[in-house]
């Protein structure tokens, strides 16, 4: 954008200032022009939306259509749709505001018991200018850049492709690789909160590795970073999923990010863990006893000794066990019992990502995400968070399979401390 980008004032000479219309009039002309542009497009606009000033939740595609002062919004998360009013006003500068409640547009700006300060979503978007047909916006609170691009297809078509890419990348590891002048770059993919982390090899006298994290949003054929990542003299803006879905490709730089498929698929399966002698190490079932002692003291309830890992099911959703952003999600959860070990009819769950560790399909990383609102995690957080931290601290885990009487059992042993292990079985 040039120095003459101002939406309210054109570049002019001092002699021409007296010919300018009053500021409020120029302001209104800008707002009216933007309203006309938004509503003149008969289809939807694709909005690449990043909540939170640190973009720690990644980016999301939201599809919006503007008609007669109302906006209809559809989210890529679950294709939910909602309609509400919108307005164009001047708050310091021209602003697109979603001024009445909309379940899609206010999803990340809604405070809950767990997300007490919401998740940093913006619903007042500063109008920064245009780039061809694209409208450039900026979140008032986060200052995140947001692009509004017109599309001429139904959102359902794009969303189907976006969700397919997302599902393909769930649980995938990425093999270490050379990027530009740096070799041995390790990469972690956080598929749920849409972030990629590049761990750079140790350099200098301190010998410490450094890392770069960058948020991205899914596209119809891959991912696009919020802003280009610079590594080893190379700038990476977007990655395309290869036709055989075995790699992510940076076609502009000729880079191939080879994907690793883990031996266990937590995104399509549900596994059970019996936290007791013989099926888990003392380090785990002993820690559960300590957590439960505190749970009983604080709440008169305790976690069941059976733990579940992986994806919840439709029947779990019916029992109010669901994710924060989508009904189905990957998580770690327990049934809640009373002091006598009888179920109280509720669960307690924490969302997690489970991904192959680098190029090793036999090792699984546990990435903690957030406690689930649906199971009132916020109420128990102080007592139970150490339990989640334990699994995260000793990740990744090496997977070893054994079969007895036709039943497969997988032993997961920490690669950091072999005293920490537990067995899981698919349900």
Show the residue positions of the predicted features:
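C-terminal motif of bacterial Sec signal peptides marking the signal peptidase cleavage site
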Residues: 6-10
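Acidic/polar, low-complexity intrinsically disordered N-terminal segments immediately downstream
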Residues: 12-99, 103, 130, 144, ...
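Edge beta-strand at a domain terminus
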Residues: 13-26, 133-175, 251-287, 402-427
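N-terminal glycine/threonine-rich, aromatic-flanked beta-hairpin/loop signature
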Residues: 52-93, 183-221, 290-371
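An anionic, turn-rich surface loop/hairpin at beta-sheet edges
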Residues: 97-120, 222-236, 363-395
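A charged, solvent-exposed segment within the mature domains of Sec-exported extracytoplasmic proteins
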Residues: 115-183, 297, 302, 376, ...
């Amino acid at each position: 954008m040039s120095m003459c980008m101002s939406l309210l004032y054109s570049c002019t000479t001092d002699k021409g200032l007296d010919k300018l219309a009053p500021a409020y009039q120029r302001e209104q002309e800008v707002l009216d022009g933007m309203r006309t542009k938004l509503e003149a497009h008969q289809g939807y606009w694709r909005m690449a939306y990043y909540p939170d000033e640190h973009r720690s939740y990644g980016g999301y595609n939201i599809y919006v259509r503007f008609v007669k002062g109302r906006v209809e919004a559809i989210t890529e998360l679950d294709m939910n749709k909602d309609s509400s009013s919108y307005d164009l006003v001047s708050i310091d500068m021209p602003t697109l505001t979603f001024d009445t409640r909309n379940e899609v547009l206010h999803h990340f700006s809604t405070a809950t018991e767990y997300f007490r300060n919401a998740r940093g979503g913006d619903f007042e978007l500063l109008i920064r200018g245009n780039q061809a047909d694209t409208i450039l916006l900026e979140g008032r609170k986060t200052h995140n850049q947001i692009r509004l691009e017109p599309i001429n297809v139904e959102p359902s078509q794009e969303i189907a492709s976006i969700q397919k890419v997302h599902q393909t990348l769930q649980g995938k590891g990425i093999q270490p690789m050379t990027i530009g002048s740096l070799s041995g770059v390790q990469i972690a993919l956080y598929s749920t909160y849409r972030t990629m982390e590049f761990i750079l090899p140790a350099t200098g006298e301190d010998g410490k590795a450094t890392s770069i994290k960058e948020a991205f949003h899914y596209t119809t054929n891959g991912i696009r970073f919020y802003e280009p990542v610079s590594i080893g003299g190379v700038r990476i803006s977007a990655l395309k999923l290869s036709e055989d879905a075995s790699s992510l490709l940076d076609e502009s730089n000729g880079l191939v990010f080879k994907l690793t498929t883990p031996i266990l698929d937590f995104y399509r399966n549900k596994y059970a863990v019996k936290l007791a002698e013989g099926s888990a190490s003392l380090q785990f079932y002993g820690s559960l006893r300590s957590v439960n002692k505190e749970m009983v003291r604080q709440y008169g309830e305790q976690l069941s000794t059976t733990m579940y890992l992986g994806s919840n099911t439709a029947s779990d959703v019916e029992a109010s066990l669901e994710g924060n952003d989508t009904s189905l999600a990957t998580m770690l959860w327990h049934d809640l019992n009373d002091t006598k070990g009888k179920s109280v009819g509720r669960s307690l769950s924490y969302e997690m990502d489970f991904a192959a560790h680098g190029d090793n399909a036999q090792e699984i990383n546990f990435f903690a995400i957030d406690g689930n609102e649906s199971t009132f995690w916020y109420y128990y957080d102080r007592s139970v968070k150490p339990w989640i931290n334990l699994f995260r601290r000793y990740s990744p885990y090496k997977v070893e399979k054994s079969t007895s009487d036709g039943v497969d059992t997988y032993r997961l042993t920490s690669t950091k401390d072999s005293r920490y292990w537990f067995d899981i079985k698919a349900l």
